[in-house]
A protein has these predicted regions:
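Selected transmembrane alpha-helices and immediately adjacent juxtamembrane segments
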Residues: 1-39, 121-171, 178
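Hydrophobic alpha-helical transmembrane segments in multi-pass integral membrane proteins
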Residues: 45, 87-88, 140-148, 182-185, ...
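Transmembrane helix exit motif
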Residues: 59-66, 89, 93, 97, ...
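Cytoplasmic-side transmembrane-helix entry/capping segments in multi-pass membrane proteins
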Residues: 70-80, 100-106, 126-136, 166-173, ...
Length: 246
């Protein structure tokens, strides 16, 4: 399935995807899938991002904020994310072009709206668990069918009004769970083979290198610059996904 040219291509794509994630905290699966699907099928592309997404988010999860505290706050989202990932992967077996197009439109629209409207949307504490469950269900469905979990998971976490460090750890925990659930869902639907697992694991290496370089730049950003970078990445990712779908 993979020759030397394909391996080189995968390395370059995941190096760039890792760099994007290092600077903004998100984007590795979406960026990688957007480019990979230009050269190979979406089913292969989705399978390849599982291990890089899982391992890079594991690295990002550890920081100054206690993980247990984040899990307690996010558990409704994580539960429904798990359940609906299987439904989304079932859709991937058949057809996911429309969902992919919709995903790209929503991402770009939200990013553009948030940049133009300076006031950040903030979710009140009393609505967090309900909206977390709804977001998890939607994220699992989109992620399982397109391999891209950034909508609406990143948008939900961003709306919780966290510090930069809290956001990075929280989104990493959510996305590491999403990658793990995606792997289970793909396996259950016979979309993940041992060969794809091996190449997906290899793809984590250039992802880590790119992420390391990106994190060196990230720590030089202040909160406002970081948020602008994050929102700009949402727009770019959305446009890439739209291009992939049409």
């Amino acid at each position: 399935m993979f020759d030397l040219d394909s391996i080189l291509l995968v390395s370059i794509i995941f190096l760039f995807g890792g760099f994007v994630k290092g600077t903004s905290g998100i984007g590795l699966p979406a960026i990688s899938i957007a480019f990979l699907t230009m050269f190979m099928g979406i089913k292969v592309a989705v399978a390849l991002v599982v291990m890089p997404g899982l391992l890079t988010n594991l690295w990002q999860t550890f920081g100054k904020i206690k993980i247990i505290k984040i899990i307690y706050r996010m558990w409704p989202l994580l539960l429904f994310l798990f359940l609906f990932s299987f439904l989304g992967a079932r859709i991937l077996v058949d057809h996911s072009k429309f969902l992919t197009l919709l995903l790209g439109i929503l991402l770009s629209a939200y990013g553009l709206f948030s940049i133009l409207v300076s006031k950040q949307i903030v979710i009140a504490k009393k609505y967090e668990k309900f909206l977390g469950a709804f977001t998890g269900a939607l994220g699992g469905f989109f992620g399982g069918s397109t391999g891209t979990f950034v909508f609406p998971l990143a948008l939900y976490v961003y709306s919780l009004k966290m510090t930069q460090q809290e956001f990075l750890q929280s989104i990493a925990l959510v996305l590491i769970s999403a990658s793990f659930f995606l792997g289970l869902a793909l396996t259950g639907n016979k979309l993940w083979t041992w060969e794809l697992f091996a190449y997906s694991t290899y793809a984590a290496i250039p992802s880590f290198i790119g992420m390391y370089i990106g994190r060196k730049l990230q720590f030089k950003f202040d909160e406002k610059i970081f948020k602008k970078v994050f929102l700009s990445m949402l727009i770019i990712i959305g446009l890439l996904i739209i291009n992939k779908a049409i």
